[in-house]
C-alpha cells in the first residue's frame, strides 16, 4: 500500500475478481530498518477509503497498543507473526469487540499458536481468525514451509476460522498459486494473497505479489477446486 491511486486501483481489481476483504499494511514490521515501513496513519485512511469505495471491509496489521486510536475505522485487526506472543497486545485485543486475525509465529507450534489465540478469547473477544503463514525450518524450497497439515489439525481442534497466507510462505510469486491450491484442498476457510498493480515496482514484498490478472486466475483455479476440498470428513 503506497499511494491513494495504487490502493484504489488494486481494491477495485481484487473486488472484481471475487475478493471479500481488502488488506493493506500501514504499519509494516520489516526485518531491515532501512526498508519501507508503511504509510502509518495516512495509510490507514487511504485503506479505509479504498475499502469503502470498493465495498469491501478492510484489515490491517496492528503492531502496538498505541496504534488503536488510529485504527478505529478498520474492520479487522491483524496480529502479525512477529507479534503472535506479544501478550500485552493480545490482552488488549481481547478487550475489543472487533475481529482479530492472528498469524502463526515463525517458529511456533500449533499448541503455542492456539494458546496465543486463547489470550484474545479469554478476554471476551470471540471473533478470532487463525492464519497459517508457514514456519521457518531451513529446509523448505520456499521462504517458509507452509504447514498444510496444520489446517485440518486446527479445524479439528477449534471452531475458529482458519485462513492461509500462501504469499508470505512462498516468498516468490510463481509459488503462490500451488500453495494456495494446496491450502484450499486441505480445507482452509480463506486465503490472504498479496496483489500489486506493478509488482516489479513495489516498495515491499514485490517478489511474492501477484498482478491483478494473476489474482483473477488464482481465484478461478481455487473456485474450481473447492468442490473437492476437504471439509472435515474422516478417511
What is each of the regions a protein language model found here?
Residues 96-198:
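Catalytic alpha/beta core domains of metabolic enzymes, predominantly
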Residues 36-60, 92-99, 148-163, 208-231:
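Alpha-helix-loop-beta-strand connector modules within alpha/beta enzyme cores
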Residues 4-5, 32-46, 65-66, 81-97, ...:
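Active-site-adjacent beta->alpha loops and helix N-cap segments on the catalytic face
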Residues 9-25:
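Catalytic domains of carbohydrate-active enzymes, especially glycoside hydrolases
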Residues 23-42, 197-207:
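Glycine-rich, proline-tolerant flexible connector loops at the mouths of alpha/beta enzymes
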Residues 19, 74-76, 125, 188:
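A structural motif
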Residues 23, 37-39, 55-66, 75-88, ...:
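Catalytic beta/alpha-barrel core
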Residues 3-13, 62-68, 176-180:
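Short, acidic/polar
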Amino acid at each position: 500500500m503506497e499511494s491513494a491511486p495504487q490502493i484504489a486501483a488494486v481494491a477495485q481489481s481484487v473486488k472484481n475478481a471475487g475478493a471479500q476483504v481488502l488488506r493493506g499494511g500501514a504499519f509494516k514490521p520489516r526485518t531491515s530498518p532501512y526498508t519501507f515501513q508503511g504509510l502509518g496513519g495516512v495509510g490507514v485512511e487511504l485503506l479505509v477509503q479504498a475499502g469503502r469505495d470498493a465495498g469491501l471491509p478492510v484489515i490491517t496489521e496492528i503492531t502496538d497498543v498505541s496504534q488503536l486510536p488510529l485504527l478505529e475505522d478498520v474492520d479487522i485487526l491483524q496480529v502479525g507473526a512477529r507479534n503472535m506472543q506479544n501478550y500485552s497486545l493480545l490482552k488488549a485485543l481481547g478487550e475489543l469487540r472487533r475481529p482479530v486475525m492472528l498469524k502463526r509465529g515463525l517458529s511456533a507450534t500449533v499448541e503455542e499458536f492456539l494458546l496465543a489465540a486463547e489470550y484474545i478469547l479469554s478476554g471476551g473477544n470471540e471473533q478470532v481468525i487463525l492464519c497459517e503463514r508457514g514456519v521457518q525450518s531451513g529446509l523448505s524450497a520456499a521462504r517458509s514451509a507452509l504447514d498444510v497439515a496444520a489446517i485440518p489439525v486446527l479445524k479439528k481442534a477449534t471452531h475458529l476460522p482458519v485462513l492461509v497466507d500462501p504469499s508470505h510462505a512462498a516468498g516468490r510469486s510463481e509459488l503462490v498459486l500451488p500453495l494456495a491450491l494446496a491450502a484450499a484442498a486441505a480445507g482452509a476457510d480463506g486465503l490472504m494473497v498479496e496483489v500489486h498493480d506493478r509488482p516489479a515496482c513495489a516498495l515491499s514484498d514485490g517478489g511474492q505479489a501477484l498482478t491483478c490478472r494473476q489474482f483473477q486466475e488464482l481465484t478461478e483455479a481455487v473456485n474450481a477446486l473447492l468442490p473437492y476440498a476437504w471439509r472435515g470428513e474422516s478417511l
